[in-house]
Amino acid sequence: MASSDTGGKSETKSERDSEKGSCCLLADKIPARYVLAALFFVGHISMTISRGGFALAVVVMVNSSSRVTPANQTDTYQLCPSSGPGNASAQNDQGELDWSESLKGVILGAFFYGYIFTQVVGGLLEQKFGCKIVYGTSTLLGTVLSVLSPVASRTSPWAIFAVRFCMGLVSGVLFPCLYGIWGRWAPPTERTKLLAICYIGLPLGNIINYPLSSFLAAQLGWEYIFYIPGASAAVWLVLWFLLGYDSPAQHPRILEEEKKYIEEGIGTNRRQKPKVPWLKVLTSPPVWALVMGQFSSNWGVFFLTTQLPNYMQNVLGFNIQTNGLLSALPFAVAMVCMFASSAAADRLIQGGKIPKVWIRRGFVITGYTGMVICGVILANLSGCNPAAAVSLLCITQGFNSLTVAGFRAVHVEFAPRFSGVTFALANTGGTVSGIFAPLLLYLDIYLSQWYDQMYNTCHGLFQPTPAAWSTIFYIGAAIQGVGGIFTAVFLRTDVQPWARGEGDKGSFDKNVELAGSKDLVIANEHAEMPTKVVEMQNTKL
């Protein structure tokens, strides 16, 4: 009879799992958390292409013939005769829009002006409505705005400024949603890997974006830089609403084993709707470590995504086709390094020999040290050696990608129930760098040109020069140096007291008790303890 009861229970469970089928047969055979990661991966590719093509489109659609390089400005290039303003600017004399360099800087920064306002809002919206609705709606609105970009650009500079501003506004909620949902989906020993799968979509999107945009601009016209990605985003939206769910508890097809593995691994009571302890969050040094990390790391990322085609054209002298291919290289290196470092971090964490906090700090220190060194070398090259400059840009992005295994995974570790909110605060700081990086470049150019006019009687409209870029690279190296030190010192990975809920302590103690009966240590919420399920050797819990 007992055998019959046991068989009945097994049959009931089997029947329950078999009933969780759908039209998406392939997705049903893959663990639900990896389906979610794949959705974010593809979504980030689509998002990056949709919003990132504008930087290269500006190079093509703006007429450069009115921006004559003054004769005396060649003095700037005297140390590097081969890097002077040669044929590159002539490539774009057919551009239909007449925008000054300063206006280009303002328009390129417009996305970030809107982006910064909805970071914290995004975290709160995710807590209230869930990631599925907020992320999907944001992507839909961003796609529509991207398709409207050609019409807005031809209407007036301020029309495209408004479109880019609104794109930033709706896009600002995306990453807070990402961190919020992984706080409910990511088991402790897989957090770095799952986040890396999502983040790899960003450099891969740029790898596809730059060659694709240069091809579309050369063969079909710059308008198609905005139209083609819009169509791909529509396909992704269908998959997102079919396959994405806010938590394992809400997923209708997840297997019970996976659901139990995730919920017991996280060890928190996800039924609570906690209020954000804003005072404790805003006065927490580990939170500010992430803000500084995001600001200093994003300085390099946002600067490249907005200014790399400009640098390739005006300083290194590449035409539009070569520009598109070479602009993709740094992001290709970043993608490889991101995947490798994330896998290495998870392996080290699972090994249990090094405290998790020092694993994270190790990647932070390595990444920022490499970025600072490369930035200083780039500043001294001044565009004299295009091959070396491109190589250093690639290496810089490779080091920058180590931050994913460093501080970027910490949000779901030190404050899992508020990970969307803490990331929103950090990314607000990161967005500031996206606003000031292009403006600082053009301010430096303007001041350099003003100095030339005062003392060298140089006349004409300013253009980006190697000297101006050198200053920017020095500033970037300084920012990354200070940010890296601050982040490494104050970074924490243990769950902070203000991030624990009423059910967390009991849930954790229960799991420890279960683990003790099996001589096991479960996935731990404290960074200084190993997070792999490891066997105890002749000791008791």
Model regions and ranges:
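Extracytoplasmic gate region of multi-pass secondary transporters
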Residues: 51-55, 283-339, 401-408, 434-438
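Hydrophobic core of transmembrane alpha-helices in multi-pass small-molecule transporters
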Residues: 145, 157-173, 295, 374, ...
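Conserved MFS/SLC helix-loop-helix module at the cytosolic interface between two early adjacent transmembrane helices
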Residues: 117-158
